Amino acid sequence: MKKRIWFNRTFSTAYHFIDMIRTNPDGLDFEFYVTHPKRYSVMLQNADVAEIEPSLSIPEYIEYCVQFCQKHQIDIFFPNYRLVEIAKHIDRFEQVGTSVLVCKDADLLETVSDKGKLFQALRDTPGLHLPDYFIVNTSEQFKIAYEKLREKGHKVCFKPASGEGGAGFHIIEEHMNPLDKLLGSSNQTIAIEEVLSIIGDQIVDDIMVMEYLDDWEYSIDCLATEEELIAIVPRKKVEGRIRLLEDNQALIDLAKAVHEQLRLPYLFNVQVKYKNGVPKLLEINPRASGGLHSSCLSGVNFPYLAVKLLLSGKVEVAAPKFGVYATHIEKEIVLRQLL
């Protein structure tokens, strides 16, 4: 009998996750359920059963998720949206017979999802380097943080402490010509005066003001149990869309140090960027990363192995193949049916 897997709202590259689970080497059959609030989402096109996901409050959304699992007899829930809230109600999913691919420790997920709390939790971790940073909520705090970082010789950037990916990321440029901002190619640069003016007298959500890291950036994709880190693939952003799966022992050791401290299970991703030859932490995603399918070119089928680990509690993984350069091109997909 086919196992039923549900993907709730997620990024479009999870389309590849479905393909990788569907073509698993064990020949197991799965039926894929996908929901998304946008009817044109490509994710809906790769589903056996697709539905439009409603816009709901958090309590209503959790109720919707539990009822969806019960109604469709979902065996495996592969969530991306509302991870923390789902983890808080994990027992409700288990009661309807659904296994959820998420860390069950909701407090840990909240910590990892907030960069300020995460950096505090990891500040004494051996082998892990953090950038110089401050958490601020007012324009005065921002100005002080900026000046202290400049005194250390750092170029300065900032982003929301609870932001995801590059949302809200800006680099502060001194003596910036407003015309350059208006007509230039980058919308990530901003003058310090403009930042302070925008914040004004407001008390805003936590902002992380930090040293700008100007060298190579890596995403480190990991598969683990709470006790063991099973697979690690560092993925280097070479240029543009070019990625390199790199046998980088320093980053492999860094991922081990993170796991030793946090004990995140299943899939997680560590993002770092180098400065002066030292890799420094940017963030940790306690879920499958958007570029995970590229790391699967190492021969490690991360999405399927995570599902197998959830179901059986154990997997065997061959050593990753490194030295793989990869990119991607656009491909047209005909929207065969619209909901």
Predicted feature locations:
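Residues that mark the start of a beta-strand
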Residues: 2-6, 155, 208
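Active-site nucleotide/adenylate-binding loops and adjacent lid/helix of ATP-dependent enzymes
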Residues: 109-206
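Short, charged, surface-exposed secondary-structure boundary motifs
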Residues: 43-44, 61-63, 108-116, 166-167, ...
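Phosphate-binding site of ATP-dependent enzymes
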Residues: 182-258, 262, 273-274, 278-280
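A short catalytic or substrate-binding loop motif that flags glycine-/basic-rich loops and adjacent residues
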Residues: 150, 162-164, 212-216, 263-265
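ATP-binding N-terminal substructure of ATP-dependent carboxylate-amine bond-forming enzymes
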Residues: 1-103
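ATP-dependent carboxylate activation and anion-phosphoryl transfer catalytic cores
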Residues: 8, 72, 238-253, 257-339
